[in-house]
Design a protein with these regions (language model features):
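Conserved SAM/SAH cofactor-binding pocket of Class I
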Residues: 107-150
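N-terminal accessory targeting/assembly segments
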Residues: 1-4
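Non-catalytic substrate-recognition/targeting regions of SAM-dependent transferases
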Residues: 8-22, 29-96, 103
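Short, contiguous clusters of charged residues that form electrostatic/catalytic patches at enzyme active sites
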Residues: 96-103, 107, 150
């Protein structure tokens, strides 16, 4: 996986035995990540705004710790602005590990020196579509996830 070091509105604050603490602009979230199997070297003990708790019946729910957490908020990456919210499946609607791919997509579109048309199938939350549009491409965004297209 390629990393980007300039996603100023996103930061991993801690990782500990299946849990990850992240800062999304000014919102601090703690949520499960099954790939984190190691103990924290520097535990994050400050307050978090919300914690996602898995249910043993499947799925889970957000436990809001800060009553002032906004229902939606924005983060920026370069000149892109994304609207986030707490989603039912432990995420926020944005996947920061994809930022490298957004960079590559934008670079390829800008370097094409021709009209570029992008068909983004299974586009889900749309960050790649936004990145392609920002680079000048014509984009068709297709997804069947009701929460993403409403």
């Amino acid at each position: 996986m390629k990393l980007v070091r300039d996603f100023n509105d996103y930061q991993i604050l801690d990782m500990d035995k299946g849990m990850k603490v992240e800062a999304w602009h000014n919102v601090i979230l703690k949520r499960p990540d099954p790939q984190i199997i190691w103990p924290s070297l520097n535990p994050y003990n400050a307050k978090v705004d919300a914690i996602y708790n898995r249910s043993n019946k499947g799925g889970g729910a957000w436990d809001i710790k800060n009553a002032k957490i906004p229902a939606t908020w924005q983060v920026t990456y370069h000149d892109l602005t994304f609207n986030l919210k707490l989603m039912g499946f432990k995420h926020t609607g944005l996947f920061p590990e994809q930022a490298y791919n957004w960079n590559m997509l934008r670079m390829k579109i800008k370097a094409a020196n021709r009209e570029v048309k992008v068909l983004n199938l299974f586009a889900y939350t749309g960050a790649a579509s936004v990145a392609a549009l920002s680079a000048g491409a014509s984009v068709v965004h297709v997804d069947s996830s009701r929460g993403m297209i409403d």
